C-alpha cells in the first residue's frame, strides 16, 4: 500500500485545562496515581537525594526537557524530580503498551493540583496507543508553545530520531518515499514527517538547533546514537546513560530478574518450574532473564552469537544452543538481544502447541510479528496483551505476549522502584551535566564519569543499610586511588 492509498489519518486532539495541554486515558485516576507515586518515592532514594541536594540551586532552570520514556509510576518520580530542579517538562511514553494510566493522570494533575485545576506537566500517553497515536504523542511531546525544546531525555531513541531525521529531510528538501521493506511503524513515521513537511517546514531544524543535548536510557537507543554519530548526523551531544554501571548492571539485570516473571505470571499464570525455557541473548538483560526463570525451577537454554557471553552462560550452568536446535521443545521463548528477526515465522510454526513467546528487548522486531500477521494465522485475544495465534495448516497455537513488544511493561508494570532509582538518578545527573556544561561536550556520545556512577551507588548502598569500608591514606596510595574514589579505572568491568 502506498502513502496515497493509506486511509486519512485522524489525529487525537489535546485536552487543555488550566493552561496545560495533555492527552491521557482518564484524568480522574490521578488520586490513585498520586498514592502510588508517594510509595515509589520512598523506594527511590537516589532521586529524592538529588532533590534535596539541588533544590536550592535549581540547576535545570531554563531547560525545556522533552521526555520519551515509559510513563510509569517510577517515571513520574523522575519527572517531578526534573521539575523540582527547575526544568519545564513535556512527556510521552516510548512504548504503546507501557503507560500506567493512573501515573500519567497524576503527573498532569501534579502534587498540588486537582482534576479540575491541574498544575503538573503536559503528558501525552495512554496504554494501548495505535502506532499513529504513538507518533502523534511523540510530536506533541516535542512541540512546545513559544520556544522549542532544548533538551531531550530518550528511551529507545525515537524522540532523537524524529528530530534528526526530520531536520535531515528538511535539509534535503524531500521526505523519502516508502519502501516495500519498511515496517508498518516506519511508514507511519514517514507519513508524519511528510505531513509536517507540508504544513510546518523547518520545524525539526529549529528543534535540532535548539537542543543542547540528549540523554539515552537503553541499549537500543544507544546503538542508534552511535550510528548517528558514525554517519556524522548527530548534531548535539549525547550521554549514554545505559552504560553507566549503576544502570546496566542493575536495571538491565536485577530489574529484569524481577519484572520478567511478573509479566509471564500476569499474562499467562502458568507454572514456570519444570518448563523448558529458551532465552535468546545473554547480555545483562538475558542474564537477568535466565537467573529469574532458573530460580523458578525452569530448565533454561540460551542462544548467543558472542563466544564470551556464551562461555559465561555455560559456566553459569545453562546449555548454549541455536534457536533451531531448541525451538521445537521450548515451553517458553524470550528474546533479549536488541537485534531483529530473532524469531521468524518458521520458528513460530515449529514451536510446541500453546508455547509462550515474549520479548523483553526494546522494539517489536526481535519477533517477526509482521510475518505472523501476514501468515494467515488466526488471532484470538485472550485478554489485553495476550493473544493466541493458531496456524491453520497444523492446528497448533502459540501464546504471544504484548504483540512482541516489551512484555514486562505490557503485561506487568516494569522494573521495581528501587532499581529504577539507580537508572533515573543517572538520567538526572546527565541532564544537569549537558545543561550546565555545554562547552565541555561536542556532538559525540559520552558516558558519565566514574565518580558520578559511584555517587549513585553510594546513595543506594546506604538506603539498603550497607556500610562501606573506608580506605586509609596508605591503602589508597598503595593501589593508586583517592581515599574518596573513584576506586576503579574506566575500563574496569564489574
Swiss-Prot record:
GO biological process: one example: one-carbon metabolic process
A GO MF label: adenosylhomocysteinase activity
Chain positions recorded as NAD(+) binding sites: 218-220, 252, 281-286, 304, 339, 360-362, 408
Alphabetized UniProt keyword annotations: Cytoplasm, Hydrolase, NAD, One-carbon metabolism
Cofactor binding remark: Binds 1 NAD(+) per subunit.
Keyword match NAD: yes
Cofactor dependency: NAD(+)
Catalytic reaction list: S-adenosyl-L-homocysteine + H2O = L-homocysteine + adenosine
Main location: cytoplasm
Top class in the EC scheme: hydrolase
Location in or out of the cell: Cytoplasm
Biochemical pathway: Amino-acid biosynthesis; L-homocysteine biosynthesis; L-homocysteine from S-adenosyl-L-homocysteine: step 1/1
Binding residues annotated for substrate, in chain numbering: 72, 155, 217, 247, 251
Any Pfam family hit: AdoHcyase_NAD
Disulfide cysteine pairs (residue numbers): none
E.C. no: 3.13.2.1
Superkingdom of the source species: Bacteria
Gene Ontology CC annotation, any one: cytosol
Function: May play a key role in the regulation of the intracellular concentration of adenosylhomocysteine.
Protein family (similarity comment): Belongs to the adenosylhomocysteinase family.
Protein name: Adenosylhomocysteinase
Gene (name only): ahcY
